Amino acid sequence: QIRNKSQKDLQQDFKKAFSKAEELANRVQLKTPDPYLNTLGGALATAADGIWEAPAYLHGSVAWRMHLNAWRGAYVADPLGWHDRAKTHFSSYANSQVLEPESGPVVPDTSRHFARQKEKIGTSMFSRGYIYRHPNKNTVAHHYDMNLVFFDQLLKHFQWSGDVEYIKELWPTLKRHLAWEKRNFDTDGDGLYDAYAAIWASDALQYSGGGVVYTSAYNYSANKMAAKLASIIGENPQAYEEEAEKIKNAIQQELWIQEKGIFAEYKDLLGEQNLHEQPGIWSV
């Protein structure tokens, strides 16, 4: 404790802390003609270290300083050379994947005016494949779909590391996730996926079962990569290749607006099945 330390001890502690901060800030160095741009490496490394709390990344370094499995944190690990942190993060959350039941009923939460699914293990969303917000714990439900971005981070880690043994280890985790996404968010099997509190832009982004461009794109990418990984580890890639192709065709045929040269944000599930022609910046 500080009150029990001498002035000399405190001085040494300060020097150690300052030295560590300086080392961290110099982890990534940019050398460009722009002196303001050159500060970004230190800012990124310092901020990235600030959201690490073993065994996983936090949602924020100041506000929302708590564990949540996705949306941004783990993306920083591999580019900054923290491959060990990346692996620890992904493994701890693989342990948070729900295994049973295999599926469940769709149960809107009446206390939330049907705006959310009931947060209870055993409903459709909180069944096999779902990953809970805290590492190393799979017995509690939480309303986000953070699976979507978490597995995008994991697949990018595989590309960074090329660790075949780790790919084999987490292959069942990936398979359960892809089945969970399909079961919950492409219930009509048309290749377009619904979105439910799935990305960083807002907790409130949901589309009442519609076919959404950005979640469909994430699932296209995940299935495409799963097919490649399957071939590497001796699994059958066919189902993932077929799903990726189905998603790609659905996006092109149902969401592309030729005269505007853009993809629609989403297509309504019910009624006239209208296209919503003003995509969010996250979709562009």
Where are the language model's segments positioned?
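Mature extracytoplasmic enzyme cores
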Residues: 1, 23-47, 51, 209, ...
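Extended acidic/polar, glycine-enriched regions
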Residues: 1-26
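Substrate-binding groove/exosite segments of carbohydrate-active enzymes
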Residues: 19-169, 262-269, 273-284
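Alpha-helical positions within canonical tetratricopeptide repeat
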Residues: 85, 166-169, 173, 236-239, ...
